[in-house]
Swiss-Prot record:
The keyword Phosphoprotein applies. This is Uncharacterized protein C1105.01. Residues 939-948 have a biased composition (Basic and acidic residues). Keywords: Phosphoprotein. InterPro entries: ARM-like, ARM-type_fold, RRP12. It comes from the Eukaryota. The modification Phosphoserine is found at residues 948, 950. Residues 939-1001 are annotated as: Disordered. GO terms for cellular component: nucleus. The keyword Phosphoprotein applies. GO terms for biological process: maturation of SSU-rRNA. Disulfide bonds: none annotated.
Length: 1001
């Protein structure tokens, strides 16, 4: 919104409060009315500049301002030109600044004064840099002071002013940062030195620091000031649970994480010395400082780290050295220290410590851990110390170099076995310890530390182990799994199969995988249902490993045989069937010369003509293999595929739905797999006409097929349409007739698929091709070859209007509606006129279903074609529609009204009245026109469609499932509609009831 419009809107709002009971609303309104009267008496325009001048005169006359004057001034200043504001700069220095310096009580007036200050500063920044910097030096301390004010609204407006100025002018930082740092030091010093401090102001100061100071732009000296100020909070007696303490930790960690190298040595030394006595309050900060300190002063840094790690270890084992359940540190709880240790796991790197110094740092600590844990196994607080020691080892593991990890293994082994013995594995700290170590160690070494290497009974009892291994195994070969876990699996513990994909998914080269191992995997699939998904995924992964493919290829026939036999014992809807099919497909893809033998074995072991095969999971295997098979392998299968449609179902199985419909269902899926295989296309094209004939021969009654079979059939037609050569379009009419029937199907998905196919075929025809008319059934044998185009496509579809089938006629009108809408720019006028004449005759039909479909076509025609084309047929269309209003039931009347409403969007009332046959028709037109006018819709829309009718929308956009043909069952509402019609006829205009009926619809 422009500033002038916003100003006028706000002033109008103020004027409306003249009689308000609230003083802060009434007084500004009275003042504004007085100014308005003065401006009007002087015959001036009510502009922001005029109000600005009047208010300045009033303030000077009163030798100061009150809330009313400064409030209105803050509203008009944004719309006042900058040059006018610069002429009155004295207002800032003589009135506003002194007021802000002396008065702290009246918050509303302060907020308005701050807004005026912002407007002056913005004007200065645009016009005069010198004036701007002078003003900034004066007002910056005030803005910072009010930015930490205890009143939220004052604080908010002050921060907004500072943020706005910072964005507008980059040169503000040298003036802004010193003011913020002064306030930071002052407020934090007060907080840390007071006996009973109020933390609010200090917290607001930290918030100001976070909002306005960019750590990456601050200088090293500025960062030093920030760290020193924040360290006062960390070393004070403020409880660690206070928000000001937590925010101080957050800010100083941000500085150390992003800009620690910018801090001077003196600052680092000072911070380390001040924080080491309070390490338990700010452990993360202290450790990060010493981590960097090593690089600046190795001897002092190593000594400090060693001291700090000793203190941390003493904390971890303190429960074992005291009878108390927990040891409290001054102001810091054990959970605070543990959380700090967890935070440091990946940030404490010790990258500047060499190997010799590492040995010094680690040796005493590791020995102390081993000794204490071993000697205190019966202590009452033993379970309390183990999670702490786990976090301590995690800290060291995150910092230690890779080649030094072996130094930690003795301590890890002692702690890990103690954790397992005391059943503490599922505590978060202990579980994290295992997960972090498995990422660093090989599986055999890890299991050896846990004591599982030679004792598989322990592995069997460790139900938590899969969670430790899951998502933490990297770069290990499958042999590791077979060596570590296969023995316990063979002992009857099949749950360990879930770890197998963790070792195979990495794709590492393996040299020791042998045929015997593959047999064990295949045997597991056949005998153990619980391992299906895991072993199947392993086979998929193994086929991707280069040096394993040959081994799998040589055993592919046996492996796929086992998978096929297993699938034959599974139900078709079994959740594991897809996994086994995926494994078989992967193995088949690397089978090479054995593919033909594999297919032969499968066909012999599971005859495709066997109806009972439909209830097993093996039916999913054939399409999957067919989709990736070479053409030569499956050429002999194509004739059998065509015969597959003629399967006879035994009478004793006819009651089973899945068996009854299995034959065509599988045939369609197999045919789809064939048609989608690019290597099979050369084998398919020569028999494409045979496939069309086969599809048509089993197409009778396709409307009655179960949904899943009908969908598979339409998907097959889609692929056949795509592969049809451009010179064989004579095969289309019979197929199109079936698809047209589906365009009226009661199921939304089938109807949407049918419309999609009709449009795709239309695009093929639009791009050209040949139609041999003599080869089309029912055509004369001596007809010529014609060029394919949209007009010929319209002829193919509209030919179905001559059929005696009521269902086909209605479906054809629906299909034509969609095609005309989609290709309106490509259809010749002669074809449009011919189809429209047929549809007009349908409008006169006494069959409501046919007439309803015709209404949908007319609605599309009116809104999708040009006005001139619609006008050509208006003399016949309008009387038919008006006849509908007078002769049909409430639902049909409603549709007819909608048609007339659409016409009134395209034509004027006079244009339509010219085609009315009598005065009654004119009255109906005038009535509908008045309804439109009462709704306030006076626009004439040319060539736009209306998305209000769900049935029409489904024809135009069938993929929109929110509005589809048949979605609303008007039969359920027929009584209501008839009742509404009766009430409507009682009124001469029909306006009120018409609106109500339309709203219900």
């Amino acid at each position: 919104m422009p500033k002038t419009d916003a100003c006028e809107r706000m002033l109008q709002s103020i004027r409306s409060h003249k009689n308000s009971k609230l003083e802060n609303q009434r007084l500004p309104a009275i003042l504004l009315h007085s100014i308005d009267n003065y401006i009007d008496s002087k015959s001036l325009q009510r502009t922001a500049s005029v109000y600005f001048s009047a208010l300045l005169a009033l303030i000077k006359q009163s030798n100061g301002f009150d809330y009313s004057s400064i409030y209105i001034l803050s509203i008009v200043m944004p719309a006042t030109p900058s040059d006018e504001k610069l002429l009155h700069i004295d207002l800032l220095y003589t009135q506003i600044v002194p007021y802000l310096q002396k008065n702290n009580d009246d918050a509303p007036t302060i907020r308005c004064a701050l807004n005026c200050t912002q407007e002056f500063l913005l004007s200065f920044s645009n016009e005069s840099k010198e004036l701007y910097l002078k003003a900034v030096d004066v007002v910056m301390p005030l803005l910072v002071k009010f930015s930490v004010d205890l009143r939220p609204k004052v604080r908010k407006i002050s921060i907004q002013v500072l943020q706005t100025l910072k964005q507008k002018y980059d040169g503000l930082l040298p003036h802004l940062y010193p003011a913020i740092f002064d306030e930071l030091q002052r407020s934090l010093s007060e907080v840390s030195n007071m006996d009973n401090p109020s933390f609010s102001k200090g917290l607001h100061t930290l918030h100001l620091l976070e909002c306005l100071v960019d750590i990456n732009q601050a200088s090293g000296s500025d960062l030093g000031i920030i760290c020193n100020a924040l360290s006062r909070i960390l070393t004070s007696n403020i409880p660690t649970s206070e928000p000001i303490f937590e925010m101080s930790i957050k800010l100083i960690l941000k500085v150390l994480s992003e800009r620690i190298d910018a801090l001077s040595d003196a600052v680092i030394y000072e911070l380390c010395d001040s924080l080491i006595p309070y390490w338990y309050r700010a452990l993360s900060v202290t450790l990060l400082l010493y981590d960097n300190f090593v690089n600046r002063n190795p001897s002092r840094g190593i000594k400090g780290i060693q001291t700090l790690l000793e203190k941390i270890l003493d904390f971890c084992i303190s429960p074992l050295q005291s009878s108390e359940s927990d040891v409290e540190y001054d102001g810091a709880t054990s959970s605070d220290i543990l959380n700090s240790l967890k935070f440091l796991r990946n940030k404490f790197t010790m990258k500047f410590v060499n190997k010799k110094n590492w040995a010094t740092v680690l040796s005493n600590g590791i020995k102390k851990v081993i000794k204490t844990i071993t000697a205190s196994s019966r202590h009452a607080n033993y379970a309390k110390a183990l999670p702490r020691c786990s976090v301590y080892l995690q800290l060291l593991l995150g910092a230690i170099p890779e080649d030094q990890i072996s130094e930690l293994l003795p301590a890890f082994s002692v702690v890990a076995r103690a954790i397992i013995k005391n059943k503490l594995v599922e505590t978060p700290e202990c579980l994290d310890l295992f997960k972090i170590f498995i990422q660093k160690l090989a599986s055999p070494t890890f299991l050896e530390c846990l004591g599982f290497a030679d004792n598989f009974c322990n592995i069997q009892k460790s139900h938590w182990l899969p969670e430790v291994f899951r998502d933490n195994i990297t770069g290990e070969t499958p042999e590791t799994f077979f060596d570590c876990f296969l023995p316990t699996i063979e002992a009857g513990n099949s749950q360990w199969w879930e770890l197998l994909p963790l070792y195979t998914k990495a794709g590492c080269i393996t040299n020791n995988l042998n045929e015997n191992t593959l047999k064990k995997l295949a045997s597991a699939i056949y005998n153990d249902r619980s391992c299906h998904s895991h072993v199947a995924q392993a086979f998929v992964d193994l086929t991707k490993i280069e040096n394993v493919r040959q081994l799998i290829s040589s055993n592919s026939s046996n492996l796929i045989g086992v998978l096929g036999n297993t699938l034959a014992t599974m139900k078709n809807d079994d959740s594991n069937a897809e996994d086994l099919v995926m494994a078989a497909t992967s193995i088949f893809s690397v089978a090479g010369d054995q593919q033909l033998q594999i297919i032969t074995n499968l066909c012999e072991s599971a005859p495709l003509s066997e109806p009972s095969l439909g209830s097993t999971g093996v039916i999913k295997l054939f399409p999957a293999l067919l989709s990736i098979s070479p053409a030569d392998t499956w050429k002999p299968f194509l004739p059998h595929l065509v015969k597959l449609f003629d399967i006879a179902i035994p009478s004793n199985l006819s009651q089973s739905l899945s068996v009854l419909n299995f034959g065509p269902g599988l045939a369609y899926r197999l045919l789809q797999a064939t048609l989608s295989n690019e290597r099979m296309i050369s084998a398919i094209v020569p028999v494409i006409s045979r496939l069309y004939d086969s599809m048509n021969s089993v197409g009778d009654g396709s409307q009655a097929l179960p949904k899943y079979v009908a969908l598979e059939r339409l998907k097959t037609w889609k692929l056949l349409f795509k592969l049809l050569p451009n010179d064989e379009f004579h095969l289309l009419p019979s197929a199109i007739a079936e698809v047209v029937l589906f365009s009226k199907h009661h199921d939304d998905d089938l109807r949407a698929m049918a419309f999609e196919l009709l449009v795709e075929v239309g695009n093929r025809m639009k791009n050209g091709g040949k139609i041999n008319m003599s080869l089309i059934d029912g055509e004369e044998p001596n007809k010529t070859v014609v060029e394919a185009n949209i007009n010929e496509y319209i002829s193919m579809i509209s030919a179905n209007l001559m059929n005696d089938s009521l269902n086909l006629k209605v479906s054809t009108i629906f299909a034509l509606t969609r095609i005309f809408y989609e290709f309106s720019d490509y259809i010749d006028d002669d074809y449009v006129n011919a189809v429209l004449e047929e549809v007009q005759s349908s409008l006169q039909s006494n069959n409501q279903e046919i007439a309803r479909a015709a209404v949908g076509f007319i609605k599309m025609y009116i809104t999708s074609f040009t006005k001139s084309k619609v006008l050509f047929h208006l003399d016949t269309l309008l009387p038919l529609i008006l006849r509908w209003i007078k002769e049909h039931n409430a639902y049909v009347k409603l549709k007819a009204k909608q048609l007339l409403d659409r016409m009134l969007r395209v034509f004027s009332l006079k244009e339509l009245e010219a085609f009315a046959e009598n005065e009654t028709d004119k009255e109906w037109l005038q009535r509908i026109w008045r309804v439109r006018r009462s709704r306030g819709d006076k626009k004439v829309v040319d060539n736009k469609r209306d998305a209000s009718d769900s049935e029409d929308l489904a024809i135009k956009n069938p993929m929109n499932k929110k509005a589809k043909v048949g979605k609303v069952d008007f039969r359920k509402h027929e009584k209501k509609l008839n009742k509404a019609s009766m009430h409507r006829d009682k009124f001469s205009t029909g306006m009120h009831t018409s609106k109500r009926v339309q709203k219900k619809n």
